[in-house]
């Protein structure tokens, strides 16, 4: 895919940003804990979340879908499927399903694409094995394909060494099948969509005021079925917020965006860098929702070292902002970027250099010199949707060719359509 430099300003309202991926995954998986119909409007119709629907269908759920409206009726009993459960590119789907299936009678095989099957799963499989789960896979159950033989699980008191919503949610799901009350704690607050959704579903779970400590009781009855409207994804919206900032004389208003405090840290970083960016809350339901107004802005360099778990998905796009800021910027304490869909630290630095930007990597982050003269280049996405979308936005300024753009469909199927509607010329 080749993106040409955009010659005209952008002034628009975007209401069709992709639905939130985290909430879509959880809606589908948590529906298996209920009885009766679960309904979601604005479900994300991307490869990752469609794979999750296929997984729960193979476990016995009945699914009706009309456009982005999805209805799920869970089975009375989870089936042991006669096929591999394909998670595609989604680490969220695989890690949550490991936790869900560990305590269910049956034999299950989880696999994914070549990228997912090389991402670390021991952070889930190890604590589950310690409470009685039987999980088998390469490198001591660190790499998929993973085979899970459901077992009776023992209660646990687990302190996570990493701040990860995927680890947290997997342990919550396993706790629902344990033989007694379980506790979970983490070093810093990760995304809390699971807690918010499970609270609305009347799950037997208590959360401390700071959100760091959970007490989960085994399920004695099905949870309350869901009927929700899924807001738009702030991580997906971030690319177009960035576009408004870097394009001269431009303004974009992003509508119906999830404004959960654990999801808007990257926007706050842009504000600290000098961006003209306002967030307005319009609705408070099980999640906070609102709109984001962004205008062309001059950015200043910044050091980012806190709340990294809250901006891990936006880090590649933030690196683009760093490259266009005045002065030096760096991001540290972000070693988790090494084990995402690609090694995002190495890949961002490599590709920015190809575009004429001075950049260097650390073990846990990168440093970028802003204000370098940009040059048109061909970059590699390494199959990482967020790398591809980040450089697509940079391409609006200097022109860029991206070697693998199909990966964008895993999370944001209408990204290219929106980019084209802004006036971008795109060749395939």
UniProtKB/Swiss-Prot annotation:
Pathway: Metabolic intermediate biosynthesis; chorismate biosynthesis; chorismate from D-erythrose 4-phosphate and phosphoenolpyruvate: step 6/7. The keyword Repeat does not apply. GO terms for cellular component: cytoplasm. The active site is at residue 313. It is found in: Cytoplasm. Its EC number is 2.5.1.19. Its main location: cytoplasm. One of its GO terms (biological process) is aromatic amino acid family biosynthetic process. It is an enzyme of class 2 (transferase). Keywords: Amino-acid biosynthesis, Aromatic amino acid biosynthesis, Cytoplasm, Transferase. Phosphoenolpyruvate binds at residues 21, 91, 119, 166, 344, 386. PROSITE patterns: EPSP_SYNTHASE_1, EPSP_SYNTHASE_2. PANTHER family: AROM/DEHYDROQUINATE SYNTHASE (PTHR21090), PENTAFUNCTIONAL AROM POLYPEPTIDE (PTHR21090:SF5). Catalyzes the transfer of the enolpyruvyl moiety of phosphoenolpyruvate (PEP) to the 5-hydroxyl of shikimate-3-phosphate (S3P) to produce enolpyruvyl shikimate-3-phosphate and inorganic phosphate. Belongs to the EPSP synthase family. NCBIfam families: aroA. This is 3-phosphoshikimate 1-carboxyvinyltransferase. It comes from Campylobacter jejuni subsp. doylei (strain ATCC BAA-1458 / RM4099 / 269.97). The gene is aroA.
């Amino acid at each position: 895919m080749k993106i040409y430099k955009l010659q005209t300003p952008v002034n628009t309202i975007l209401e069709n940003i992709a639905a939130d991926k985290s909430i879509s995954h959880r809606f589908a998986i948590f529906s298996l804990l209920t009885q009766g119909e679960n309904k979601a409007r604005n479900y994300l119709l991307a490869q990752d979340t469609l794979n999750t629907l296929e997984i729960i269908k193979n476990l016995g759920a009945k699914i009706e879908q009309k456009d982005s409206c999805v209805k799920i009726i869970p089975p009375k009993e989870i089936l042991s499927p006669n096929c591999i459960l394909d998670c595609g590119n989604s680490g969220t789907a695989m890690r949550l399903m490991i936790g869900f299936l560990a305590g269910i009678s049956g034999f299950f095989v989880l696999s994914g694409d070549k990228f997912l099957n090389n991402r670390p799963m021991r952070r889930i499989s190890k604590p589950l094995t310690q409470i009685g789960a039987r999980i088998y896979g390469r490198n001591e159950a660190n790499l998929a394909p993973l085979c899970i033989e459901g077992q009776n699980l023992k209660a646990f008191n687990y302190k996570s060494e990493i701040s990860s919503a995927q680890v947290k949610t997997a342990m919550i799901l396993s706790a629902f099948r344990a033989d007694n009350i379980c506790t979970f704690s983490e070093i810093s607050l990760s995304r809390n969509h699971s807690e918010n959704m499970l609270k609305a579903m009347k799950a037997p779970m208590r959360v401390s005021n700071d959100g760091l400590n959970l007490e989960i009781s085994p399920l004695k009855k099905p949870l309350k079925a869901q009927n929700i409207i899924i807001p738009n994804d702030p991580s997906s919206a971030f690319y177009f917020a960035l576009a408004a900032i870097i394009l001269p004389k431009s303004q974009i208003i992003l509508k119906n965006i999830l404004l959960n405090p654990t999801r808007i840290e990257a926007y706050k970083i842009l504000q600290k860098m000098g961006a003209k960016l306002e967030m307005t809350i319009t609705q408070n339901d099980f999640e906070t929702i609102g709109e984001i107004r962004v205008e062309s802005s001059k950015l200043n360099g910044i050091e980012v070292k806190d709340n990294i778990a809250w901006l891990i998905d936006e880090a590649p796009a933030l690196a683009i902002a760093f490259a266009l800021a005045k002065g030096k910027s760096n991001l540290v304490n972000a070693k988790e970027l090494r084990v995402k869909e690609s090694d995002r630290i190495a890949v961002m630095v490599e590709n920015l250099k190809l575009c004429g930007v001075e950049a260097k990597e650390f073990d846990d982050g990168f440093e970028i010199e802003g204000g370098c003269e940009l040059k048109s280049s061909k970059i590699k996405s390494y199959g990482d949707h967020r790398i591809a979308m980040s450089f697509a936005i940079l391409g609006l300024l200097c022109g860029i060719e991206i070697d693998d753009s199909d990966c964008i469909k895993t999370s944001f199927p209408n990204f290219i359509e929106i980019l084209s509607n802004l006036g971008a010329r795109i060749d395939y």
